[in-house]
């Protein structure tokens, strides 16, 4: 009996150690898995430094979104830290509620053919995002996502017109706070990218006195509704 108990205890310890190893191996691959999914949605290169989570928070470090081909700026979007606050069980529901998303140290690159043109890097990216949401599986078509608060801290932006090749460093925006951002249809990640990115872009364009360009951008995106 004693030998049996020792063997059973040893087996339990081995199972626990195996579980811990599998967990850490899976966690180490998580940034690449999320980056790959985002890259497929946006059709651009995406890199993520690290991802950590608790039962109520997801923390993403050093997210970098590249530009589509034939654009000169290195990045379309970068953020040093993203904090997503919502119980993990919320993501299993049909109607998903996220209490708050905070983005710290944000950079956005805006690139257009000319001051008069509206064809640019974000036209391409948002078109790709809209297509990904439209093509989501039927099982996710009825899902809704509500972000109660979206907070951006310390936003820097560059503006480049390809016609003159000059990079303009726009004034830093200390903070943007958006509330009650909602969307329906598509999986959670596609909805977050489409609704949250759209609202962030709109507010940044307004703050940088570029709202007219923003409105024209959304007119060019098939199947999208202008962000209100």
PLM regions and their residue ranges:
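N-terminal leader/targeting pre-sequences
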Residues: 43-70, 153
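N-terminal start-of-chain detector that recognizes signal peptides
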Residues: 17-25, 30-36, 54-57, 71-76, ...
